From Swiss-Prot:
It comes from the Eukaryota. Residues 143-272 form the PX domain. Binds phosphatidylinositol 3-phosphate (PtdIns-(3)P) and phosphatidylinositol 3,5-bisphosphate (PtdIns-(3,5)P2) in liposome-based assays. Can bind PtdIns(3,4,5)P3 in protein:lipid overlay assays, but not in liposome-based assays. Residues 281-298 are annotated as: Membrane-binding amphipathic helix. Keywords: Acetylation, Cell projection, Endosome, Golgi apparatus, Lipid-binding, Membrane, Phosphoprotein, Protein transport, Transport. This is Sorting nexin-1. The keyword Phosphoprotein applies. One of its GO terms (molecular function) is leptin receptor binding.
Length: 522
């Protein structure tokens, strides 16, 4: 390394000639002398390699530590046709020998030598990976775990009855006791799992997938009513919603590592979840807390330092409004499709009755065939109504609830910021109080004031770290959520279009088969 003394000349700082170095090379390495008065500057340029590359117009001669060809220029810039580019970093370390350098120049023409990193370059901070890169690294870990919910079973009678679902897990992860296992869970167990996960992870900025909403009317029909089509339809909708909810839970890497999730999937019997009923004391308290948080959120005016969070929150709010409108339209479509199926069935019955009373044999047969076609079309309309609901309406409903959780993550970050600001304000008051005590010359209270200042300084530091940590988590969670949403919508839309295509193909096939019967009418 270059010494700090300004009186040393460049020739005194040159290293001794390398073994095997011919006289011409030695002369080329040490023959040129720097101009007077520029020894310090040129010495620094040689070792850092900055000035020689950035000042091509300078006529000053530079001292090279390696042999160069005769056709090279002396201003630090060399023509590519005449010689290979010089490396001025190579003298920063003694590990590079001349022989190896010359061999590299012979075997790799036209390429710049790669120097060993200097101490300054080694100590320089590495660039932090972006959140997208972190997310891609996270997605490289494939979680081989699939859950399925089947066999809804009504247990008990009357209002004390409940429905138990079979939760089957298939996995190759070593954290579980076996590769496949099954347990029985009721709806309140799913709600209890969400409450536990939300209590632990939501305050840190994580997006905990929400369970399906409660339905007092639907469950009342199941409890006190008979097993009819409406009860079976309600249970199927809830089963599918619970399966999607649980699959989102286990797909989240943080949630999967939670012991409550593993206990939910493996343990035969769980303690009864309390506070999950809508009209219970705990439920009413949660409603009150939500209302209080909504009011407090309106009073917080956050000075956003990162424009990304402000723009992303606006996107989430706008998307939630659009999804709500689209969901309302899709629900109307489902109802119209069901009405169409019902009216098509009535139309088929009327055609069958008309065909049975017709005297013309060909016309009677054609009407009977048309009635059969309409019955098949009624089945197509019913199947498509179910596809409209399960593939489209339920998807929109899920993401409306998920976007509400995303907004809650932004709100939690805002609350963390407000706590940090409140601590800073309190610290400022403590310091002002200490100044007044010093001015009033009250040493008996001064030590207590200093202790309080120390305590609040540590709190401010901790709250600032909490805010930085939750900001990082929220950004990463939103990025992950958007990728999962895109993949989810793509899969569901493709399936939905396939069902529409299949329905139209079947419809065309039915009409093509009926056309000869219509032409045979005489």
């Amino acid at each position: 390394m270059a010494s700090g003394g300004g009186g040393c000349s460049a020739s005194e700082r040159l290293p001794p000639p390398f073994p095997g170095m011919d006289p011409e090379s030695e002369g080329a390495a040490g023959g040129s002398e720097p101009e007077a008065g520029d020894s310090d500057t040129e010495g620094e340029d040689i070792f850092t390699g900055a000035a020689a590359a950035s000042k091509p117009q300078s006529p000053k001669k530079t001292t090279s530590l390696f042999p160069i060809k005769n056709g090279s220029k002396e201003n630090g810039i060399h023509e590519e046709q005449d010689q290979e580019p010089q490396d001025l970093f190579a003298d920063a370390t003694v590990e590079l020998s001349l022989d190896s350098t010359q061999n590299n120049q012979k075997t790799m023409p036209g390429k710049t030598l790669i120097p060993h990193p200097t101490q300054e370059a080694t100590n320089s901070p590495k660039p932090q990976p972006s959140y997208e890169e972190l997310e891609e690294e996270e997605q490289e870990d494939q979680f081989d775990l699939t859950v399925g919910i089947t066999d809804p079973e009504k247990i008990g009678d009357g209002m004390n009855a409940y429905v138990a679902y079979k939760v089957t897990t298939q996995t190759s992860l070593p954290m579980f006791r076996s590769r496949q296992f099954a347990v029985k869970r009721r709806f309140s167990d799913f709600l209890g799992l969400y409450e536990k996960l939300s209590e632990k992870h939501s305050q840190n900025g994580f997006i905990v997938p929400p369970p399906p909403e409660k339905s007092l009317i639907g469950m009342t029909k199941v409890k006190v009513g008979k097993e009819d089509s409406s009860s079976a339809e309600f249970l199927e909708k809830r089963r599918a919603a619970l399966e999607r909810y649980l699959q989102r839970i286990v797909n989240h890497p943080t949630m999967l590592q939670d012991p409550d999730v593993r206990e939910f999937l493996e343990k035969e019997e769980l303690p009864r979840a309390v506070g999950t009923q809508a009209l219970s004391g705990a439920g009413l308290l949660k409603m009150f807390n939500k209302a209080t948080d909504a009011v407090s959120k309106m009073t917080i005016k956050m000075n956003e330092s990162d424009i990304w969070f402000e723009e992303k929150l606006q996107e989430v709010e706008c998307e939630e409004q659009r999804l709500r409108k689209l969901h309302a339209v899709v629900e109307t479509l489902v109802n119209h499709r069901k009405e169409l199926a019902l009216n098509t069935a009535l139309f088929a019955k009327s055609l069958a009755m008309l065909g049975s009373s017709e005297d013309n044999t060909a016309l009677s047969r054609a009407l009977s065939q048309l009635a059969e076609v309409e019955e098949k079309i009624e089945q197509l309309h019913q199947e498509q109504a179910n596809n409209d609901f399960f593939l489209l309406a339920e998807l929109l409903s899920d993401y409306i609830r998920l976007l509400a959780i995303v907004r809650a993550a932004f709100d939690q970050r805002m609350k963390t910021w407000q706590r940090w600001q409140d601590a800073q304000a309190t610290l400022q008051k403590k310091r002002e109080s200490e100044a007044r005590l010093l001015w009033a010359n009250k040493p008996d209270k001064l030590q207590q004031a200093k202790d309080e200042i120390t305590e609040w300084e540590s709190r401010v530091t901790q709250y600032e770290r909490d805010f930085e940590r939750i900001s990082t988590v929220v950004r990463k969670e939103v990025t992950r959520f958007e990728k999962e949403k895109s993949k989810d919508f793509k899969n569901h839309v493709i399936k939905y279009l396939e069902t529409l295509l299949h329905s139209q193909q079947q419809l065309a096939k039915y009409w093509e088969a009926f056309l000869p019967e219509a032409r045979a009418i005489s």
